[in-house]
Amino acid sequence: MSKHYEIQEIFLLKERKIDMANIGVFDVLGPIMIGPSSSHTAGAARLGKIAKTVVNKPIKEVTFLLHGSFRETYKGHGTDRALVAGILGMSPDDPRLKESLAIAEAEGIAVKFLPTDLGQVHPNTVKLLMTDCDDIRWEVLGSSIGGGMIEINEINGNKVKITGESPTIITCHDDIPGTVSKISTLFYENEINIARMTLVRSQKGKDATMTVEIDSKVSDDIVAKIKAVDGVNRVIVINSLGGN
């Protein structure tokens, strides 16, 4: 990473007011991985892996819009191979990561990389434009913020905040009274503790997106009950990436 981007990343961390006392030594050193950079390799693989989880179907084509230092160094630092490895479901320490481009081609997945400017975002940011096996299009915007840590900021244009450090439930639902309360009650009744919850809506009475980070995984039965709540249109489940 160039000195310019290192300085820029330091300033961004300060702006985010990250509590350095809560960042451990392994967050600083980064995870076990294949490749030269925790931000450009491990973080990139995690971004791709979460995007695959969001789609939750075979992906037949993906375009990576690369911003900032991703745009400048994606070949030399292996970001291209790491992103594709994530789309294939690989973890940062998977030895097959180096061959991910060839593996994707063999599996019939069309891959394209487009350097671009995504505006006022973190320098290690990528937008993934994906098409699944049913020809449904998906967009995921995320950043690798250092030490292998990541943030997903948008899914299909909806604002979210996903770190991948905890199991996460995302609901896309109608903005009607009682929906959030009913979902929260399901967590309470099943003794599932909520670590963090965020809710955004496009406008009053229209579409809303809720992101809930929880302390434990949820069963398929609970997910089915959430899907059955009046007004819920889609439920996305992201299990913790943990060390991977």
Predicted regions and their residues:
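Acidic-glycine-rich active-site phosphate/pyrophosphate-binding loop
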Residues: 14-25, 56-60
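Short, Lys/Arg-enriched N-terminal segments with co-localized hydrophobic residues
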Residues: 3-19, 242
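Short glycine/threonine-rich loop-to-helix capping motif typified by GTGT followed
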Residues: 73-79, 123, 209-213
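C-terminal edge-of-domain segments
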Residues: 105, 110-138
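Beta-strand segments within the central parallel beta-sheet cores of soluble alpha/beta enzyme folds
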Residues: 59-68
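A conserved regulatory-domain signal marking ACT and ACT-like small-molecule sensing domains
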Residues: 113-116, 140-244
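A structural-propensity feature for long, helix-poor, extended segments
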Residues: 67-102, 106
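Conserved phosphate/anionic-ligand binding catalytic regions in large, soluble enzymes, centered on
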Residues: 30-48
